[in-house]
Structure formats: C-alpha cells, structure tokens
Amino acid sequence: MKKIDFKVLLPNVITLSGLSFGLSSIRFALEQDFNLAILCILIAGLCDVLDGMLARHLNSESDLGAQLDSLSDFLSFGIAPGILVYMSIFNQESGIGTFACLVFIIFSCLRLALYNVRLELSKTSEEEPDNFFTGIPTPVGAILILLPLTHSFMGFDWAYENLNFVAAYIILI
C-alpha cells in the first residue's frame, strides 16, 4: 500500500475546506442568513489563497489539486454568490434576476473550464505559456457580484429599488 505524503495532502484539505465554506454559504443563503453566507464566501477566498501558496511552498502541486481548486472555485465563487444574490435581492422577482444570476454562474464555469484547458495545453506546448486568464478571476467576480448586497447591509437600499440595473450590472461582470 502506497503511503500518503502529508505535504501533498495538506493543500487539498485546505481546498476542500474552502469547498465546505462555499457549500455552507449556499445553506445560509437558503436560510436567509445573508451575513453568514457572505462570511463563508470570504473564508472560502482565504482558503483559496492559502491552498495555492502552501502547495507551491511545499512543492506539492498536483493535477488532483488543480482540479479540486477549480471545482471549489466554481462552487464558492460562482454558484454560492449567484444563489446568495438571487435569494437576497431577486427572491421575489423571477425574470431578469434569475437570468442575471444564471449568466453569472454559467460564465464562471466557462471561465474556469477555459483556464483548465489552457493550463493543460501549456504542459504539452514548447512555447512560453500566454496569460491564462480570460476576463476577471472568479474570486474577483464573486466580490463584484456581492457589492450591491453589501451596500444594502450598510443602509443603501438602491439595489432593491433598481433590480433591472443590478441585473444588468451582474450580466456585465
């Protein structure tokens, strides 16, 4: 039986912790505890930073880790913020708000998949890799989609009064 090296395992444990916080964010959003839902997304972001730094520091980067990271990013910074914004701002509106949140989630998935494909192609290419990022990084997108919600927590209710504007803003992200 092959022995599992702790230094390879540790970054993946942190990634899976981030995934757990993303899942918890969805749970809290569905329970309408929006403050905790946002906090979970922020902690997932911290896990996302730490897992990569630790993997590079321990020289334990792996294909499994890269795939787990993308899946965790999609859930924590694509699905969770989309559901959170839908539940908090668009909960009573089914049309444009639903569409905007779906567009955000779908394009988060596409962006991460494109990144993974480019990363894989760069491994077989002899050329110097291009910048893999297309558009804004998914964690930044999560921060941007949450701005209208965080403004409402500070007493600025413009997001609830301008649903079409918020939907257009989300689609542009």
Describe each region flagged by the PLM.
Residues 24-39, 75, 79-102, 147-166:
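Helix-coil boundary and interhelical linker segments in multi-pass alpha-helical membrane proteins
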